[in-house]
Structure formats: structure tokens, C-alpha cells
Design a protein with these regions (language model features):
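Membrane-helix/interface signature in polytopic inner-membrane proteins
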Residues: 181-221
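Cytosolic-side transmembrane-helix boundaries in multi-pass membrane proteins
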Residues: 1-25, 180, 207-214, 286-322
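Alpha-helical transmembrane segments within multi-pass membrane transporters and channels
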Residues: 94-134, 276-277
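Single transmembrane alpha-helix segments in multi-pass membrane proteins
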Residues: 31-93, 117-124, 257, 261-271, ...
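Transmembrane alpha-helical segments in multi-pass inner-membrane proteins
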Residues: 227, 237-303
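Transmembrane helix-bundle core of multi-pass membrane transporters
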Residues: 122, 126-189, 215-218, 237-246
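Transmembrane alpha-helices
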Residues: 211-235, 247
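Membrane-interfacial amphipathic/re-entrant helices at transmembrane-helix boundaries
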Residues: 1-60, 94-100, 210
């Protein structure tokens, strides 16, 4: 191929990547909103957007790994609420910071591990197993709070939700660290490559000596821990916990992952695309607020975005198959 033809092919391949198209859409939406609202590009609003989508991005890293292996986790939102309530209750009892932190992360890991065991050892479909866990976690949240929000006096825990390092919120720095770790894990470790191998072909992965069940249990457990981190951040931001924290997060997280190029068929997706997808979701939610669009339209928009992203992925796969 001539240098010119090679250059054209590289440009075409670049624009065929879902995350690049989403990034272009994100930039276009931001430009449009900067004209539609004088508040969009203010420093305060930009920080609000970053804080808003940081939780979705953290959860989407875990959700993406599960989807890439061919599964799905509908319980992430409820687990966020459950770990937040559990952590707030422990903190309110006067437990030392280290004990409180370990208990929050530990309970998230246990929930994720339980999901993984249900799927691999009992053979329950991920959709059903996590749907059941969604109900269990929400019910446990109500039992802990007795339907009344738990208030936590501003302590060390508030640093996670409301603290800053320079001009950046701690929650945003936490998100960037998790995205960075996720990127290295997915691209530079054997375990990360095994996640993709399981999603591409479970049978081939088994023949290659990959312990498929262990990989699936691992990604569910990681997602549980990430949900507990989000629960901790919410307690810090709002100085307390409510049984309905995280309600609806599962759809936002799935949308962010799918928009970012994670295929619901499994075996495909990358962490940087997930970050862009989460950012797009955050900007869209912020746009609804700035433009005074009724809140229920946000739910409609999320559904439209998921269907649209899945449809585009399906069309792209059919075109590639030809």
C-alpha cells in the first residue's frame, strides 16, 4: 500500500472505534451546551459534572468486566446503597476509621463473591442471580436504616466524598486511579486478557487452560468492591446514608459501558471507552438540569441511549461479519 492509502486506512480504522465516535459526540454536545447555557462552562458546574459521573465511571469499570465475560450485574446500584448504609451504621457506632473502611470494602466483596458463586457454582443466569441480589441488598438497606436516613457527623469519611486535593475532588481522583488500574489490568496482565478470552469463547478459554469460573467470580467480586467504594463516597458527600442510595445506577452504569464500546455479546470493550461513556452520561444529566428538563425524561433518555448504543453495536458486528 502507498503511504497515502495506508494513512486513509488508519484514519478509517480510527473512526470505526466506538469510543472515538462517542468522544466526538461528547465534544459536540459540550459545544452546544456552552451556547445553550451560560452556566455550563463555569468551574463550579464542571466540578459538579466530574463528581456526578465519577461514581458511574467507577462502577462501569467493574460492570464492563462482567459484560465482557458474557454476564451482567443488575445489583450494583442496590449494593452501593447497602454498603453505604452498612458503613454509616458502623461509623455511627464509633468504630475506628480502619475498621469502618475494611468493613465497607469487605461487605462489598462478600456480596460480589456471592453473585459470582451463584452464577458459577449453582448455575443461575447472571441476570436472574443479580436481580435477586438487587432485591436482597435493597431489603437489607431498609432493615439497617428502618426506613430512616442515618446521619453521620462530618469525620474522616467526609474526605472521600467532599474532600479536595488542590482543585480536584477526592472522588474524581479516586475515579481516575481506578480507571488507570483498570486500564493496566485489562491490557497488561494475564488475568485481564483472560477476561476477554472467556467472553470471546468460553469453550476455547477452557481448552486453553483458563479457569473460567475463577475469572467470573473475580470480576463479580471486584465489582462488589467498587460498589462499596461508591457507597463510601456517597456517605462522605451526603454525611449519611439512605436505603435508596444508588437507586437506578444499574441502568446508568450499563449505558455508560455500552456507549463506551462494551459489547453486550461479550469479549469486546476497553476502559478508556468506558470513561468517555460515563462522561457522556454525566454531561447529559447535567444538561437536563441546566435546561430545566423534567427529571422523568432522564429515565427515558437513558433507555433510548442504551437501545441506540446496542443497535449500533449490532449493526457494526453485522457489517464486520460481511
Amino acid at each position: 500500500l502507498s503511504p497515502e492509502a495506508l494513512h486513509k486506512r488508519n484514519i478509517k480504522a480510527l473512526f470505526e472505534k466506538p469510543e472515538i465516535n462517542v468522544l466526538i459526540a461528547l465534544v459536540a454536545i459540550c459545544i452546544g451546551l456552552s451556547f445553550a447555557s451560560p452556566y455550563f462552562l463555569t468551574a463550579k458546574n464542571i466540578v459538579n459534572i466530574l463528581r456526578q459521573f465519577s461514581l458511574i465511571a467507577i462502577l462501569a469499570v467493574g460492570q464492563a468486566m462482567i459484560i465482557i465475560t458474557g454476564g451482567i450485574d443488575l445489583s450494583v446500584g442496590s449494593v452501593v446503597g447497602f454498603t453505604a448504609c452498612f458503613g454509616a451504621a458502623v461509623a455511627r457506632m464509633g468504630a475506628p476509621p480502619g475498621i469502618t473502611l475494611l468493613s465497607i470494602l469487605g461487605i462489598g466483596a462478600v456480596v460480589g463473591l456471592t453473585n459470582g458463586l451463584f452464577v458459577t457454582k449453582i448455575g443461575i443466569a447472571p441476570f436472574i442471580a443479580t436481580l435477586g441480589m438487587m432485591s436482597i441488598a435493597r431489603g437489607l438497606s431498609l432493615l439497617i436504616t428502618m426506613g430512616v436516613p442515618i446521619h453521620v457527623d462530618p469525620t474522616w469519611i467526609s474526605v472521600f466524598g467532599g474532600g479536595y486535593v488542590g482543585i480536584f475532588p477526592v472522588s474524581v481522583i479516586t475515579m481516575l486511579m481506578i480507571v488507570g488500574i483498570g486500564f493496566v489490568f485489562a491490557n497488561n496482565t494475564t488475568l485481564g486478557r483472560n477476561v476477554y478470552a472467556v467472553g470471546n469463547s468460553e469453550k476455547s478459554a477452557k481448552f486453553s487452560g483458563i479457569r473460567v469460573d475463577q475469572v467470573r467470580i473475580m470480576v463479580f467480586t471486584i465489582t462488589g468492591v467498587l460498589a462499596s467504594i461508591c457507597g463510601l463516597i456517597l456517605v462522605g458527600q451526603l454525611e449519611g446514608a439512605d436505603a435508596f442510595y444508588g437507586n437506578g445506577y444499574e441502568l446508568d452504569v450499563i449505558a455508560a459501558a455500552v456507549i463506551g464500546g462494551v459489547s453486550l455479546s461479550g469479549g469486546e470493550g476497553n476502559v478508556l471507552g468506558i470513561l468517555v461513556g460515563a462522561a457522556l452520561m454525566g454531561v447529559l444529566k447535567n444538561a437536563f438540569v441546566l435546561l430545566a428538563v423534567p427529571g422523568y425524561w432522564q429515565v427515558v433518555a437513558t433507555g433510548v441511549v442504551i437501545i441506540g448504543a446496542v443497535s449500533l453495536d449490532s449493526l457494526r458486528r453485522k457489517r464486520t461479519a460481511k
